[in-house]
Amino acid sequence: MYKKEIFRDLDKKYNSHLYTGLLGFFMNQCHKRLENFSNNNKHFNKILEIGAGSAPHYSYIKHSYDEYHIAETSDYAEDFHKNNPKVKLIKYDGKKLPYEDETFDRIIISHCLEHILSPEEFIQEMMRKLNKGGILSISLPTDPGLAWRLGRLFIKFFTIKKTYNISGEEFNYMNATEHVNSIFNLISIIRFNYKGKFKEDFYPLKLKMSDINLFYNVHIHK
């Protein structure tokens, strides 16, 4: 969850901040739209979700599957899932996924890649863990696009004190240290490395412009 020690106690308030009200509506729609891909009616043997936190994606999945694995870095997320019979959780270092290559039919990473210091290398790491014909599903905020910045400004002045009990300055610092990768750089990395192998979806508008949307979903086929 949150990387900085001073924000660790906010892990417990993550869902009340992101999954309630208008923001919660958009977040839920983002999860639902991540299930819109060409072969989402097939059966997947093994699924891996990376960084599920306290808002796992499995409740949105439309297709059938046999096993649902979660790879996590935080103690809070580990405790959140430890008694869940639906998942097989493993804690890892945030860099190397502790699985054999070509293990999973689908890998899901929702609102995590913007936090990872070496995103290109981590995408390659995820692709190695996919079986041939597998799919990597990525969901991202369009930070620092214009629409996202306007939304963050609203949160800073009207909701962050109520939900997190932190100041606007602390909120700015939290975002500066958490969202270390811009949506523009991440999209460029994906488009350059996986030409002809991906399908994009912008939300809430369909125009492929980060500045006028809030979320970016992409599916990369191996």
Task: Describe every region a protein language model picked out.
Residues 53-96:
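Class I SAM-dependent methyltransferase SAM/SAH-binding core
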Residues 8, 13-25, 29, 117-127, ...:
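S-adenosyl-L-methionine-dependent methyltransferase catalytic module, highlighting the catalytic core
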Residues 106-117:
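A short SAM/SAH-binding and catalytic strip from SAM-dependent methyltransferases
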Residues 25-44:
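Conserved alpha-helix/loop element of class I SAM-dependent methyltransferases that forms part
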Residues 46, 66-67, 135:
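Residues at the starts of beta-strands that form the adenosine-phosphate
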Residues 95-107:
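A short acidic, Gly/Pro-enriched loop at the edge of an enzyme's catalytic core
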Residues 43-53:
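Conserved class I S-adenosyl-L-methionine
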